Amino acid sequence: MVATLRRCAAAVAAGAALLLSGCGGHPSPGPLSAMASPAIPPSVADIPNPLRGQYEDLLNPLFPQGNPAQQRYQAWPASYDASMRISWRQLQPTDPATLPGDAPDDRKFDFSAIDDTLTKLASRNMRLSLRIYAYGSDPHDPGIAVPEWMRPATTSYPAPPNSPGATQVVPNWDDPHYLDAFGRLLAALGRRYDGDERLAVFEFSGYSQFRDQSVSVASIRQLVAANVDAFPHTQLVVNPQNPEIVRQLLADDVTKKLSGPVGIRSDCLGVASPLPGWAESGDSQYVRNNDAVVNAIKQRLRSAPVITEWCSLPGGADPKGYYEKGLHDVVKYHVSMTSSANFPDRDSTSAMDPKLYALWAQANAAAGYRYSVQARPGSQSIQGKVAAISVEWTNYGAAAATEGWAPNYKLVDYTGAVVRTLPATVNLKTLVHDDSSPSREEAVPATSTDTVHVDLSGLAPGHYTLRASVDWQQHKPGASHVVNYGPMALARDGRDGSGLYPIATLDIPRDNQISTSG
């Protein structure tokens, strides 16, 4: 017994046995103790973060607060994101042939609408997703999207007889003059906005499908190169209706030129799948031939943003089935963002049915990433002077975070001061479950376990808290305007004023004494 006590005393002197259980050969769990903090379910609350959930589509206010008839429902949490589309006609009304060759971009183009929108959004802590269009696909809109001086490179298609539609003015997509001029527009936009962190997303621009009108592979390559060269530091997305455009944009050589893989921007949530028919239908030649582009777009859903817009409810369709499909597709196709407009109840003058609202709300809350973190009880240990504990990171959302978020741990003393910052090894970008169920109403949680090691050397006796945070690191090189966000909001309680979440306590006794019995 005396020998045992001597061995224990020696261990204390070395500082290696803060909480050993009698030094009888049984390892101690160590001084770390897990703190329980269950995740907040998507059915209870939305967790707002950048590039996820409901966004202000085409600058329309969020629902339900954007509709006075929906005051019975609580306002949706503010979004970090809004989208805008603007016509080429508005951006470049002046024929460049009438200007000096060395005229600055501000004389060649009218950027005021984009500049004003960026400024207003930044004042609300928001960023912009931008699309430029040369053809407006609304069959009832007689507006012309190309500048007047570009009319010779277009074709007018009258509306069918006895129809309420308007004449459509569509660019000749393979016209060299059109391609060259639109490429110069993209280059100017890139010079002005690619280094602006207020611009989060740029949608592939320069082509829109009209009836059975086609575009050549050579023209596609030219447009893809123009978009990629203009915005190498901005997240690109593409409406995937044209498989050859998708093939080019998802190619490895394009991905290497960009800050991140190209994402998907899909129309018609609630009616059509976020994946186009050519990538899913058994009648598609791409599916039948097992074309590589089919697998490429399916895999891309898990690694890049999927931004959706709701679709108008078809005549005679069931609203319940519409919202159910929207929810199921959000989960199945890893949707990141859902629009604030274009669904049936958006502008309704009567209150939304509570059951339909629940489906709509669940679709928005499930969209995007939804991380939580907690230490696993009973996993703590100590070896020498290093205490350890297992930490579980779980994503309860339909998609992974795709931007620059850096998880880490901080050891905080009783005064609230951070005394240690410890690295995390979890990769949040890969933390998403690949579930293809067509009718799931919640994403399958995906969990990754990290081990935190705390070196006790040099720590003064006292009470400490081990806290987790996910810090914003999404920046553009040499940015003209910088956007800084606080740490990511996690789906759990306990966030402190610095955006940290407590996961464990660490107690170092004042005297480091070891109690023995017998």
Regions found by a protein language model. Give the residues of each.
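C-terminal motif of bacterial Sec signal peptides marking the signal peptidase cleavage site
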Residues: 20-22
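Bacterial signal peptide processing site
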Residues: 24-26
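N-terminal substrate-binding region of glycoside hydrolase catalytic domains
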Residues: 32-174, 296-352
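Active-site groove signature of glycoside hydrolases
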Residues: 158-215
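Aromatic-lined carbohydrate-recognition surfaces of secreted/lumenal glycan-active proteins
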Residues: 198-211, 224-248
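Extracellular/luminal regions of secreted and cell-surface proteins that mediate adhesion/ECM remodeling
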Residues: 361-518
